[in-house]
Amino acid sequence: MVKIDLITGFLGSGKTTFIKSLCESLGVINTMSSPTYSIVNEYNTNFKYKIFHFDLYRLTSEQELFELGFEDYILSNNYVFIEWPDLAIPYLDSYLRIIINTENNNRYLRAEIIKSS
């Protein structure tokens, strides 16, 4: 099962709203907010796992990514949702990429499962 989801789309396309809905369906019990300034939010669930929600928009280097302890998060066997994932992609073996496009006030989602060889 792929537990790392990358959510891409333009500013304002609904990435955070989509992730909040995913978190609710996965049993998140605490209040959710955008990690735009905190970079990563941690959520507890009604189950044994946690959810880590990253927003990498403000990061400018791989060094910043690893100073956050990124490797520990992706190896934790918990759910990891990442907005603006470009810096993270080279370090992921497999993931689900969800692309959000908007057109005429509608949102269109496309999902791709990516596995490294």
Regions found by a protein language model. Give the residues of each.
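Pre-Walker A (Motif I) flank of P-loop NTPase domains
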Residues: M1-I4
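Hydrophobic anchor at the beta1->P-loop junction of P-loop NTPases
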Residues: I7
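P-loop (Walker A) phosphate-binding loop of NTP-binding proteins
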Residues: F10
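Conserved glycine(s) of the Walker
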Residues: G14
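Short phosphate-coordinating micro-motif centered on Lys-Gly-acidic
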Residues: E24-G27, Q63-L65, D72-S117
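Short beta-strand-centered segment that lines the nucleotide-binding/catalytic pocket of NTP-utilizing
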Residues: V28-Y43
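Switch II (G3) loop of P-loop NTPases
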Residues: I51-L59
